[in-house]
């Protein structure tokens, strides 16, 4: 597939955030939902990161890093500006003809 036909990373982030918001209340602990909601305006982030190699063990197929993007959603540490409280790691297809999303939720 030509990379020009792939969904942009910005659109992938937007889709990931929409999916996260829709599923968070059912998938996270109530305290994490409250924490995320209360602090998102000041510290919240959704960002595309380098797709890690462990996804194949979670989804059962080899992940093409051109066709799939990893998005992390969580809270940024104000001291070092790092997204270190991750509520969800998401693998999303960038192929508009092959919709796919897999989420690894935060577990305490």
Curated annotation (Swiss-Prot):
InterPro entries: dsDNA_mimic_put, Put_dsDNA_mimic_sf
SUPFAM superfamilies: Putative dsDNA mimic (SSF102816)
Gene3D superfamilies referenced in this protein's UniProt entry, alphabetically: dsDNA mimic, putative (3.10.450.140)
Similarity section: Belongs to the putative dsDNA mimic protein family.
Database matches in HAMAP family: Put_dsDNA_mimic (MF_00680)
Function: May act as a double-stranded DNA (dsDNA) mimic. Probably regulates the activity of a dsDNA-binding protein.
Protein name: Putative double-stranded DNA mimic protein PBPRA1522
Species in which this protein is naturally found: Photobacterium profundum (strain SS9)
